[in-house]
Amino acid sequence: MENRKATEAGQDVTMQKEDFAVLWKTIHLKVTDTYEVPPEILWVNGSTIGTLGNFSASTGKAKSKKTFNISAIVAAALKNDEVLKYSAYLPPNKRKILYVDTEQSKYHCHKVMERILRLAGLPTDKDRDDFVFIVLREQTPDKRKQIIGYMLENMPDVGLLIIDGIRDLMYDINSPSESTDLINLLMRWSSGYNLHIHTVLHLNKGDDNTRGHIGTELNNKAETVLQITKSTQDGNISEVKAMHIRDREFDPFAFRINDSALPEAVDGYVFKQPSQDRGFPLAELTEQQHRTALENGFGKQVIYGYENVLKTLKQGYASIGYKRGRNIHVDLNKFLVNKRMIVKEGKGYRYNSDFHY
């Protein structure tokens, strides 16, 4: 049995010379090579959130109006103009948009499609060649990936792929191997077909972390992760901010659903500043203070269990003179996770020394 496993493992890692020669041409980077800057296609208030050859994501809890926000992005891309706070420009040879929904019925998907066309100022009584909408609710995760892959292979002019429900392309959102494979697939699709992929994933109910191991992988690899949150001041308003972004961070904005059932910007909206405990200015601590506290608390360990993570934070930050109660350490944990100063590893959390403060 062990010999058979070893043989199978060997087959996975052994590569023929001819196969490697072909692969070498695609993986070898030389300083004399020249590469074009990836074309920018999506912006928010002047900040780039999407380029060809990359992928991004929208996250939010249930009822935060994630799909309304996605509708504005797609409408902007359809008209190559501005919708809500999103601006888009798809090159002439990349004008087609493929929208994949894995969650809703055809009735509800049809409402989304009509909403997008109305946002773009386009007629809803005429089909368009540059906007293809498919409903994969009834398919298995493997079949969904096969269908998307086949369509991309046979539709070379797709510039924007929307996947509303990335978790439905996998069986277990907490599987590290399945999550890695899916993110690698997104990267192959985006670079291989020179398009931008925008996905949708839920946030955990109890905190502001993206759901499952797939959420961790998204945060690590995505060009931009947008967070859509229902306003605590007005339940009819949703707030949009950058959870992670490679370009400069844009000012958050808010939108509501108007009488025509379309999202519209809420001008003059004042964002409520998150409350912080007096004497514990999370964002005002220096980078070195955070590093010292986390090194003293976590070291190189992976800490398992939420309460153990809080205990580790309490010990680490006490070592630099910050002794606070449990509620503050709950807020501190959220702050550190959002800043990727501590990251999920398997079912535990570890200190990430490679963070940017």
Question: Language-model features: where?
Answer:
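Phosphate-binding/switch region of NTP-binding enzymes
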Residues: 55-63, 177-264
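Alpha-helical scaffold elements adjacent to nucleotide-binding pockets in ATP/GTP-utilizing enzyme cores
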Residues: 72-73, 108-116, 147-150, 181-185, ...
